[in-house]
């Protein structure tokens, strides 16, 4: 299973999909990308998080709830699909065996069942799932009890992957740039220094005191300071010297990094910038918001809507419905 950490090229990460094989206990298949990591990544960058919220809000805005599928269950499933590329529904039956309700199951914990759960010599059916609990146990669902909708991945057909996966490195880089800048200010607005004393006539006690003060002066993070005492160097120059480790003014490209990564993140999500509250940097602006919303509805919301309309095909009846926007009213 892949988590996020070291930057690696896309073409060198083929090992990622080896983890769609069975877990060590054989109870379920591991997803190619850790869904819990994807869920936490939602909070790493403002544009990344708000782009996903915008997608969810726009789809839920026109959803028509019913006795079969409530607005809450639908919204939670949409969040799962947008964030992880997977969503799951549990079927609830009446005494006659008809499906009367669908409830959301959390994608972070749902897994395709493995061989250890099946006695059928023909293997594991495609519609057999388990819910993995954080403490290690799991809940087993009956075959055909769970409906799984997923965003198709060309490298494996068991789990889906989110469409924004191509922008994950930009989300992480933007987060690292922000954290570095925060640590820089916590550190006292410097990147650290080397304090050197040579032939300064310091006693060992005085040298230890200076060392402790230097260690106590630095904050949490990147700016680390060092103290070097040379009791007898033979030099007659600069008995006390401060050597800067780095210059934040010339070495830091914070704004350039933030601007570039944010453009990449917005592109990965396919949401017009004006709909995310971005302030234009030029007099031309970012266009008409209503027109941008119409464009996103056609190229973003409608394709996502088709994913959930597939529930009607699975159930054999038209239970999932959406209303249409009134663009004239929005433009007024």
Language model regions located:
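Flexible, gly/proline-biased loop segments at the beginnings
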Residues: 1-115, 158, 248, 289, ...
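Short linear motifs in intrinsically disordered/low-complexity regions
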Residues: 7, 13-15, 26, 35, ...
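Short, surface-exposed loop and linker segments with low hydrophobicity and enrichment for Pro/Ser/Thr
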Residues: 79-82, 118-124, 186-187, 219
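Aromatic side chains
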Residues: 81, 88, 128-129, 185
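Extended, charged amphipathic alpha-helical segments
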Residues: 2-3, 10, 131, 136-264, ...
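Generic hydrophobic-segment detector
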Residues: 16, 70, 75, 87, ...
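Active-site and NAD+-binding cores of ADP-ribose-processing enzymes
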Residues: 32, 95-160
């Amino acid at each position: 299973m892949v988590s996020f950490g070291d930057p690696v090229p896309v073409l060198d990460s083929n090992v990622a999909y080896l983890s769609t094989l069975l877990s060590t206990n054989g109870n379920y298949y591991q997803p190619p990308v850790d869904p819990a990591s994807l869920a936490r990544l939602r909070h790493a960058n403002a544009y990344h998080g708000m782009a996903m919220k915008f997608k969810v809000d726009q789809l839920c805005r026109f959803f028509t709830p019913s006795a079969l599928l409530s607005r809450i269950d639908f919204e939670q499933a949409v969040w799962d699909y947008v964030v992880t590329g997977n969503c799951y529904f549990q079927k609830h039956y009446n005494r006659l065996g008809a499906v009367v309700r669908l409830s959301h199951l959390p994608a972070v914990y749902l897994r395709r069942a493995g061989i250890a759960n099946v006695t059928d010599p023909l293997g594991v059916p495609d519609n057999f799932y388990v819910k993995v609990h954080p403490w290690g146990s799991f809940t087993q669902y009956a075959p055909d009890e769970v409906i799984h909708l997923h965003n198709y991945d060309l490298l494996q057909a068991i789990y889906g992957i989110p469409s924004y996966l191509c922008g994950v490195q930009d989300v992480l880089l933007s987060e690292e740039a922000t954290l570095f800048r925060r640590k820089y200010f916590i550190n006292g607005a410097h990147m650290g220094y080397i304090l050197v004393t040579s032939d300064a006539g310091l006693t060992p006690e005085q040298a230890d005191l200076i060392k402790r003060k230097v260690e106590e002066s630095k904050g949490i993070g990147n700016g680390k300071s060092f103290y070097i005492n040379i009791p007898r160097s033979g030099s007659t120059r600069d008995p006390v010297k401060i050597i800067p480790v780095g210059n934040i003014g010339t070495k830091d490209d914070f704004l350039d990094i933030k601007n570039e990564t944010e453009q990449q993140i917005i592109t990965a999500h396919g949401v017009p910038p004006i709909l995310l509250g971005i302030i234009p940097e030029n007099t031309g602006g970012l266009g008409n918001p209503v027109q941008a919303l119409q464009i996103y509805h056609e190229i973003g919301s409608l394709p996502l809507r088709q994913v959930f309309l597939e529930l009607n095909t699975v159930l054999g009846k038209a239970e999932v419905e959406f209303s249409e926007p009134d663009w004239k009213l929005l433009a007024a």
